C-alpha cells in the first residue's frame, strides 16, 4: 500500500508543476505567526507549512488565546523536532477558553522554557522592520488588539495582516448537508470581537480568509500520504492528528488556518476581493456598502490548494538533532 501511495504521489506531484514551484522560491518575506495552536489541528499544519516554505522568513511565533503558555510550549516542541529552535517563541495574553486543548498531552511532554511577551515582541520587530512584516493571524485577535492599544503608531507600520477568520456569504459546513449554512459568527472573530473591530477600523492592509474559502478537508487519502514518509514534521502531524481525533471525536481535519499561510506564500491560491466589512459585537462579519477596508478571499480551489500543500509537507527535509521532550 505504501508503494502505491508513493507512486501515485510522485505522478501527481510532477504532473501538477508543484515540483517546479517548490524548486523556485521567490524572495523571502518577513512574517510573524500568531496562533492558538493545540485546540483544532489546523494550526499545527499551518505552522508546518510555514516551516516548509522557503519564501517565508519567520521572525517569531506568538501564542494567542486560552492557555498561551502551554501553546508556547507546544510551539517550542514542534520547532525543536524540526530543527528550527532558532525561531523565537513568545507568549500572548492568557484568557479563559472553553475549547478543548486536544493536543495537550503532546504539548506537555515538551520541555518547559520561559518566554517573553508576545505583544511587545510584535512591536519590537515592527520597529526594526517598518513596512516589511506580514502578521499571519490564525487565532482570536486579542494580541493584535492589545498591540493597537499599546502602540498604535508602531503597529501602523505593519506591511499587512493576513488572517483566518470571519464568515461573509456562507457559514460552517456540515457533512451530509447539500447547502452550506448561512453566514454566522466564526470562532476567531466571536472570541474577541472588540479586537477584530479595532483591527478592521485601524487602517493597516488586512487580507481575510473567512469560512467561505477555508473549509478544505484533509481527506483520508491525503492523510495517508503523510505515512509514506517519515520526517520529524510528518510524524508530529500524524501524532497530533490522532490526538485531535481521539479528544474531539472528529475524523477529517479542516485546513482553515493553513489557507492563511498558503495565501501569504502565494496569493494566487485564494484571490481576494476588496470589500467593506463590519464586525458586530457578536463577531459577525457583515458585508456593507462603503469604501473597502479588507481584502477578502471568497472562494478557493481545493485541488489547487492541496497540490500546493502536500508536496511541501512531504518533500521538506526539516530535522532536529536535540531531545525535545522533558526527562
Task: Give short role names for the model-derived ranges.
Residues 27-28, 33, 69-128, 133-134, ...:
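Metal-dependent C-N hydrolase catalytic cores
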Residues 38-39, 254:
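Short glycine/threonine-rich catalytic loop with a Thr-x-Gly-x-Asp
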Residues 4-12:
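Sec-dependent N-terminal signal peptides
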Residues 25-35, 41-73, 110-208, 212-214:
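Active-site histidine-anchored catalytic micro-motif
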Residues 12-20:
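C-terminal segment of classical bacterial N-terminal signal peptides
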Residues 100-102, 172-175, 219-221:
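Short, well-ordered secondary-structure micro-motifs
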Residues 25-28, 45-52, 187-190, 194-327:
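Conformational coupling and interaction surfaces
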